[in-house]
Amino acid sequence: MSIKMPEMSLFSKKKTNNFLLDHMIELLLVVLIIALWIVEPVFMTPGNILNVLRNSAMKGVIAYGMCLVIISGEIDLSVGSQVALSAVIVAWVAKHLNDAGIMPLAAGAVVGLLVAILVGLLIGVFHAWARHKFGMPSFIVTLASLNILYGLAAIICGGFPITACYPDWYIFLGTGRIAGIPVPALIFVAVFFVFWFITEKTTLGRQIYAVGGNAEAARL
């Protein structure tokens, strides 16, 4: 019994260290929240928590997408420009379809969203194609597209905001509340569960982790 005790202690210590390494970010987040709570008690009030969730929702949704890229061992520097271009496309398509009398803003906004999603998909396909066709690092590919996409957004909008009387449902997505909870926060949470399901419960998620660990071994 006296011989096994050190082994058990060593195993327990190793298990604890592994847990700390695997959950370092979560633990640091908890420490940060507690520190802010002590310094400013109003930080943990329901109103402030909902406000933080609302303000961080868009960045959080973008971060989930970036996580998949980083897990696969790549990087995308053009995300901010893609967001800007997508927003401009939605507004431009909706406004011009309405001004041309083709469809009202409510329907035009839907078409604009679909066009923006398609453009984002094509940008991602182009990045992947350039990365594998020419063997260019994703850092270089996306660094170049960062400026190109931002320039396209500026050209489309002419450097000025695209103003229009957008439909209520469109505005509701950004400013509305359901049961007192901001809609962006609900979208953020919903995307989290989708992200978790993909990475933890699907073959695609395991493949992404495998590619990030060793792309050549994953290919074989």
Question: Which residue stretches match the model-derived regions?
Answer:
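Membrane-interfacial amphipathic/re-entrant helices at transmembrane-helix boundaries
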Residues: 2-63, 98-111
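Transmembrane helix-bundle core of multi-pass membrane transporters
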Residues: 6, 134, 138-202
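Hydrophobic alpha-helical transmembrane segments
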Residues: 22-30, 52, 60, 81-85, ...
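Hydrophobic core segments of alpha-helical transmembrane domains in multi-pass membrane transport
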Residues: 25-38, 66, 91, 117-120, ...
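Single transmembrane alpha-helix segments in multi-pass membrane proteins
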Residues: 34-98, 129-135
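Small-residue-rich segments of transmembrane alpha-helices in multi-pass membrane proteins
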Residues: 58-59, 87-91, 144-153, 217-220
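Alpha-helical transmembrane segments within multi-pass membrane transporters and channels
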Residues: 99-145
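Membrane-helix/interface signature in polytopic inner-membrane proteins
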Residues: 194-220
